[in-house]
A protein has these predicted regions:
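Non-transmembrane functional regions of envelope-associated proteins
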Residues: 1-131, 164-185
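Protease-associated
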Residues: 127-165
């Protein structure tokens, strides 16, 4: 926990659940404009969090949810409705911390400057710092995959004394397990 806190930029994931009702403190500001975004987001009654000491030490906590049920990831929900609280996706929360932003702005139908003609048509976009992310009505965003493969490095290479920490300068580092590794859980 002390290593997480002293680093200052660690983001932890939490898993939406309809059986668990864990709570954690949000680490961001939120501005909602227009219709209530909770109406348009996937709703869960709870969330599976980490140990409280770890959650409290992290700079942010994001929801780990995929969205589509066909195992092909095309869109990513940017927020989840967890028992009435808006929880950002792990990706969005990582971006918030990486750019040093403190507040999300969710602009939905019937917000100032948005055309909806009185209809509740959904979430239009999420603003984070100077970045505006257009969304589908359910608050999800299309994923634009790059042609460049993601660089993966096994932990044993990082733990080697010869490995230079400078490799990670200016980059976002995601630490996790491989899909086969999940079978041990």
């Amino acid at each position: 926990a002390s290593s997480i806190e002293s680093h200052g930029t660690v983001i932890l994931g939490a898993i939406p659940s309809n059986s668990l009702r864990n709570q954690f403190d949000m680490k961001f500001g939120l501005i909602e404009q227009g219709d209530n975004p909770r109406k348009f987001l996937k709703k869960f009654s709870g969330i599976q969090t980490n140990l409280k000491i770890l959650d409290n030490s992290a700079k942010g906590i994001g929801s780990m949810s995929i969205g589509d049920n066909d195992s092909i990831i095309r869109r990513l929900p940017l927020f989840e409705n967890i028992n009435g609280s808006l929880v950002p996706s792990l990706s969005l929360e990582t971006l918030r911390v990486a750019i040093g932003a403190s507040t999300f702005q969710i602009k939905s139908s019937n917000a100032s400057g948005e055309t909806a003609f009185g209809e509740e048509t959904g979430i239009n976009h999420v603003k984070l710092g100077n970045l505006i992310i257009p969304t589908n009505e359910d608050g999800s965003a299309w994923i634009h995959y790059t042609n460049d493969p993601i660089k993966t490095i096994p932990i044993w290479k990082i733990l080697d004394k010869e490995f230079s920490e400078e490799f990670f300068e200016g980059k976002i580092l995601i630490v996790g397990t491989s899909a086969p590794g999940l079978f041990d859980l």
